[in-house]
């Protein structure tokens, strides 16, 4: 069982991390051009591809249902608008790269909508993954990068093999893919506009609380 996580970047390129069923880091790639994904991804031999970006614009309004549902749990995320003209806005450039990533591999890994994730490309959000796996929002006073590394370590991923924050996010994406392959996942939202996959079969009845800062 293998899951490939992809962290999306604009000028820096994409970061890829491949995890196996034992959560070992099997391979990585840095600064990958989105146009090379269709050749590179099959070479990794993943059972699922987890991309840290939405697959398309919202169907209407200023955000997608999946993003609104995440915020109900206290997990803040960027909105994906429905207006394609927003593609010209510099802020949304990373989203358009994400759209391209989904399209680049859709022949081998079609976009996930419902059912099993095996052989699919799923949307993930590393921050949300870390919240769900830890059970808390990140504590104040601890950098997001350090917190996410700790979440990986607490779930048996050797974060020492990861050289950057982008690789950490790609590893969290891949870890989400492993949970999804094991059918331990939730995917709130509307499949027509994309659903963020979370690494838990059930979600809490109340919003997540913030973790207590570690003692100094």
What are these regions (language model features)?
Residues 1-216:
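Phosphate- and other anionic-substrate recognition elements at nucleic-acid/protein interfaces
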């Amino acid at each position: 069982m293998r899951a490939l996580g992809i962290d999306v970047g604009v000028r820096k390129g994409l970061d890829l991390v491949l995890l196996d069923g034992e959560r070992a880091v099997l391979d990585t790639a840095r600064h990958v051009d989105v146009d090379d994904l269709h050749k590179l991804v099959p070479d990794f031999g993943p059972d699922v591809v987890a991309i840290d970006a939405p697959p398309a614009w919202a169907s209407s309004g200023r955000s997608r249902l999946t993003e609104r549902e995440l915020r109900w749990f206290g997990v803040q995320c960027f909105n994906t608008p429905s207006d394609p003209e927003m593609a010209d806005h510099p802020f949304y450039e990373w989203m358009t790269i994400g759209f391209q990533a989904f399209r680049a591999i859709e022949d081998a890994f079609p976009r996930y909508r419902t059912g099993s994730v095996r052989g699919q490309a799923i949307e993930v959000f590393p921050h949300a993954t870390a919240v769900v796996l830890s059970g808390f929002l990140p504590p104040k006073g601890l950098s997001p990068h350090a917190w996410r590394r700790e979440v990986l370590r607490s779930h048996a991923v050797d974060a020492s093999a990861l050289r950057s924050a982008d690789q950490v996010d790609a590893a969290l994406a891949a870890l989400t893919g492993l949970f999804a392959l094991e059918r331990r996942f939730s995917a709130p939202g509307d499949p027509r506009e994309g659903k963020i996959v979370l690494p838990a079969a059930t979600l809490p009845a109340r919003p997540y609380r913030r973790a207590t800062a570690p003692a100094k």
